[in-house]
């Protein structure tokens, strides 16, 4: 049974019904509709913490989806799962791929910055100050770009950047 038919809560059911209606009425190809169905099922599985199932759905969606903008969100979500699983290197690969297709994806920029900041903190703990400095600078670059795109978001990053200027 497809995940879209297993949703138990009201919001998921409502989203599924609306999405199914849109899929039926929008003038899109069967391939695009199928890609969206996999993407939707991936989001549902991801929301429930079923990461392996979500990845399977996202990979299927990637095989079918041809629109670069839509692919960027699939790639971004794959990056999120790898981040959640602690596979930061893999996550970065997917975030970079997402940005290549959609440079105006501030959440990918933010997540890249978070990973670099985390790695900088790890380097600091290992007394690798030069490595930490490079990683902090990378984090700052990505956060600055994310903030440029969405100035009212990422308040913690903005605060960190301001503190950093005063050091």
Curated annotation (Swiss-Prot):
It is found in: Plastid, Chloroplast thylakoid membrane. This is Photosystem I assembly protein Ycf3. It is a peripheral membrane protein. Keywords: Chloroplast, Membrane, Photosynthesis, Plastid, Repeat, Thylakoid, TPR repeat. GO terms for cellular component: chloroplast thylakoid membrane. The gene is ycf3. NCBIfam families: PRK02603.1. InterPro entries: PSI_Ycf3_assembly, TPR-like_helical_dom_sf, TPR_rpt. Pfam families: TPR_1. It comes from Tupiella akineta (Green alga). Belongs to the Ycf3 family. Its main location: plastid. Essential for the assembly of the photosystem I (PSI) complex. May act as a chaperone-like factor to guide the assembly of the PSI subunits.
């Amino acid at each position: 049974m497809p995940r879209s038919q297993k949703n138990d809560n009201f919001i998921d059911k409502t989203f599924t019904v609306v999405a199914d209606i849109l899929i039926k009425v929008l003038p899109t190809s069967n391939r695009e509709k199928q890609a969206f169905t996999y993407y939707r099922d991936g989001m549902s599985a991801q929301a429930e913490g079923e990461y392996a199932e979500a990845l399977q759905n996202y990979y299927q969606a990637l095989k079918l989806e041809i629109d670069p903008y839509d692919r960027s969100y699939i790639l971004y979500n794959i990056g999120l799962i790898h981040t959640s699983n602690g596979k930061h290197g893999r996550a970065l690969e997917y975030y970079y791929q997402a940005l290549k297709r959609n440079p105006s994806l501030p959440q990918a920029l933010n997540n890249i910055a978070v990973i670099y900041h985390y790695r900088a903190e790890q380097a600091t703990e290992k007394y690798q100050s030069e490595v930490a400095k490079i990683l902090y600078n990378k984090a700052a670059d990505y956060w600055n770009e994310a903030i440029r795109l969405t100035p009212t978001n990422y308040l913690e990053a903005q605060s960190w950047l301001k503190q950093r200027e005063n050091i």
